[in-house]
Amino acid sequence: MDPRLVILSRGPGLYSTMRLTEESQRYGFITRVIDPMSISTTVDDDGGRIYHQGWPIQADAVIPRIGFSITRPGSGIVRQFERMGAIVHNTADAILLSRDKIAATQVMADCGLPVPKTISVASMEDCMQALRTIGSYPLVIKASEGTQGASVFLLDD
């Protein structure tokens, strides 16, 4: 029996989604692209179920393409696939972690990866103190959440 792959994507016509579909089919997967926001779930002691347009979905593997705007509900769908035993390329925890820049930096540091001095601030006043603490330029200033370089600024001096 051919393995069943679900690609979770809000954009089935996106180039990257189409290429994933083409390549997975070339390797013998039965591939479905499903909008994660069109999925319903049932959670129970037996692992639960996932439905799309009223029909149960079975997947051996899942490739989530969860955009920032649907991080929370999308990661819930991904977690349900995990609970049902599917191999998931990007786990729900990894998706959530990738959206939180401070937590991601903490995990990298805990794993022994070199990270730049990073300061998280709660207010503009704290930001000025952080600038004095770091003490040298250039600095990169980022919003605590976001993707693809949104709200990232380079401060030269």
Residues of each region from the PLM?
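ATP-binding N-terminal substructure of ATP-dependent carboxylate-amine bond-forming enzymes
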Residues: M1-H89, D93-A94, A103
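Active-site nucleotide/adenylate-binding loops and adjacent lid/helix of ATP-dependent enzymes
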Residues: D2-R10, L20-E22, I57, F81-G85, ...
